[in-house]
Amino acid sequence: MTTVGIMSSIPGQTMGVGVYTDYLILHTGLNRLEISMAYMTGTILSSLLLPTAGRLYDLWGSRVMIFLAGTGLGLALLLFSETVWVLKKLELLVPGIPRTTLGLFLMILTFLMLRQFGQGIMSMVSRNTLAIWFDRKRGFASGISGLFVA
């Protein structure tokens, strides 16, 4: 089960996001550098929040946290899939702000959510749960799990 959680974190990993760069450039009005800056900013913000998620994991346990991570990742993927629609709606709501500025903030939020719930919490909870389940042969169990993730 933990291996499925680790594999579920792929949409939050660089390899899961990078394939959409050209699509995002075309539809958000951002250039490659701005997309990269948004990704970096989302990643840094996520890294600052991850210790709090670790404390919540210690407090609530793996079942609650894997549910929250899965729900958050699902919402992040929904936002990511509807970026163009959300950007159009934002342009109508705040007409004075340029499309690229709105696109930049939307992409920062989207990347923050993808990195936090996918690469961050989902990976952390899944790997820690695997380590808790196995007292003996922990390295072997981790290696078997790694076969499916690699």
Predicted regions: what they are:
Residues M1-R32, L49-A53:
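Extracytoplasmic
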Residues M7, A76, K89-I121:
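Hydrophobic core of transmembrane alpha-helices in multi-pass small-molecule transporters
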Residues L24, R115-F134, S142:
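Intracellular juxtamembrane helix-capping segments at the cytosolic ends
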Residues L30-Y39, G103, S142:
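Juxtamembrane helix-start elements in MFS-like secondary transporters
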Residues T43-I44, A150:
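Short hydrophobic/small-residue motifs within alpha-helical transmembrane segments
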Residues L48-S62:
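Helix-to-loop junctions at the C-terminal end of transmembrane segments
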Residues V64-L79:
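Structural signature of the two symmetry-related core transmembrane helices
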Residues F134-A150:
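Glycine-rich segments within core transmembrane alpha-helices of 12-TM secondary carriers
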